[in-house]
């Protein structure tokens, strides 16, 4: 089969999807990638479903002009709000992969205590998430809306006093009943794993959906016969609606961390 060198498109409301792109670069190192972050309109988690759908379709149109062969919606909020409509519109042209919280592995670990799901308010309010919760109704799961957290990470604040103070206010009150695992339901949040561990000061499992998403992407590339056969390392291009050097530099910095 001829090598398929067209890039894989990644999209997020900002720099968060870089956490998923990092995993893809590890597993699919010979693929080319193009990433679009919509930091100008971030955060998506406080917008209406219709607003998020419109912004998501605008982002996909941008990526289609880059001649992508597959699409990864590396944003939990956009996946919740728009993945069904995206697949209706584009799945006959290319595979479309979304992301969801890594609730299944958290439940399967069978640890004592509550499973905390940190996510944006919209992700937690959407029917897609509620259906996911119903599948694990026998487990002790506590949704934790985290308004304002995406904004801190977009500013590059992944460690230090400000982010730790925010996390303390959210997480410390939940420690009393025991925490079995923390599930990161937003692709921005893996960048603060160290800070979460520091605040909780205990052996808590912290899980995100990046690996599962990339495994699904790999399966889809094989299914559609569009995986790259080249042996050399692929190229990565990052774009952002904010059109500022700061956000592009932050994106590449997060990719390398």
UniProtKB/Swiss-Prot annotation:
InterPro entries: Asp/Glu/hydantoin_racemase (IPR015942), Asp/Glu_race (IPR001920), Asp/Glu_racemase_AS_1 (IPR018187), Asp/Glu_racemase_AS_2 (IPR033134), Glu_race (IPR004391). It catalyses: L-glutamate = D-glutamate. It is an enzyme of class 5 (isomerase). Pathway: Cell wall biogenesis; peptidoglycan biosynthesis. Keywords: Cell shape, Cell wall biogenesis/degradation, Isomerase, Peptidoglycan synthesis. SUPFAM superfamilies: Aspartate/glutamate racemase. Its EC number is 5.1.1.3. Pfam families: Asp_Glu_race (PF01177). The active site is at 75 (proton donor/acceptor), 186 (proton donor/acceptor). GO terms for molecular function: glutamate racemase activity. Disulfide bonds: none annotated. Gene3D superfamilies: 3.40.50.1860. The keyword Transport does not apply. Provides the (R)-glutamate required for cell wall biosynthesis. Belongs to the aspartate/glutamate racemases family. This is Glutamate racemase. The lineage of its organism: Bacteria, Bacillati, Bacillota, Clostridia, Eubacteriales. The gene is murI.
């Amino acid at each position: 089969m001829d090598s398929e060198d067209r890039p894989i498109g990644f999209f997020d409301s900002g720099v968060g999807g870089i956490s998923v792109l990092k995993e893809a670069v590890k597993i699919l190192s010979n693929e080319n990638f193009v990433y679009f972050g919509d930091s100008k309109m971030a955060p998506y988690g406080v917008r209406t479903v219709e607003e998020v759908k419109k912004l998501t379709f605008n982002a996909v149109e941008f990526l289609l002009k880059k001649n992508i062969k597959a699409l990864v919606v590396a944003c939990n909020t956009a996946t919740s709000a728009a993945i069904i409509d995206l697949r209706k519109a584009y799945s006959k042209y290319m595979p479309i992969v979304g992301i969801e919280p890594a609730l299944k592995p958290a439940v399967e670990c069978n640890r004592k205590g509550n499973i905390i799901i940190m996510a944006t308010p919209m992700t937690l309010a959407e029917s897609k998430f509620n259906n996911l919760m119903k599948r694990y109704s026998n487990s002790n799961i506590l949704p934790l809306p985290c308004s304002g957290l995406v904004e801190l990470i977009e500013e590059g604040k992944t460690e230090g006093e400000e982010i730790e103070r925010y996390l303390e206010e959210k997480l410390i009150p939940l420690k009393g009943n025991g925490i079995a695992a923390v599930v990161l339901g937003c692709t921005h949040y893996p960048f603060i794993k160290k800070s979460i561990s520091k605040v909780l000061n205990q052996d808590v499992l912290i899980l995100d959906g990046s690996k599962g998403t990339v495994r699904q992407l790999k399966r889809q590339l094989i299914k559609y016969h569009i995986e790259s056969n080249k042996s050399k390392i692929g190229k990565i291009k990052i774009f952002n609606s904010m059109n500022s050097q700061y956000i592009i530099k932050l994106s590449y910095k997060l990719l390398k961390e």
